């Protein structure tokens, strides 16, 4: 456990170093003119694309990265750190990204819950059939899917 804590502490120190380094590159009293607030059609397009990117990232990675705590914990820690920045561009952008990330995660959780409910109903329906109508291989596949969803 102590190795995990040391690694976790190092990771957090790296995030704070990155935040400090990034903040030093940008004037804290910036003009407020950054991609999320910049006027113009191309920046409006960026704003929409940025939000879509975060949602698509979660949707595409729902079977791979979301089940691995390491990248998600790091991403959430990074966004949390930047949302506390004195630089408005970092603060607003990371807060928006975090909100889109959480919204997308809720969508994935809802889909998973719906799949679990459907699977449970199908399993119960198949199990309640008479012995002559029941398909053992179907029961087995539904049970496997149930285990996979949990």
Curated annotation (Swiss-Prot):
> What would be one Pfam family of this protein?
STAG
* Highest taxon listed in the record's lineage: Eukaryota
Question: InterPro entries, from UniProt?
Answer: Cohesin_Scc3/SA, STAG
Q: Which family does it belong to?
A: Belongs to the SCC3 family.
The name this protein goes by in its record: Putative STAG3-like protein 4
Q: Which organism is it from?
A: Homo sapiens (Human)
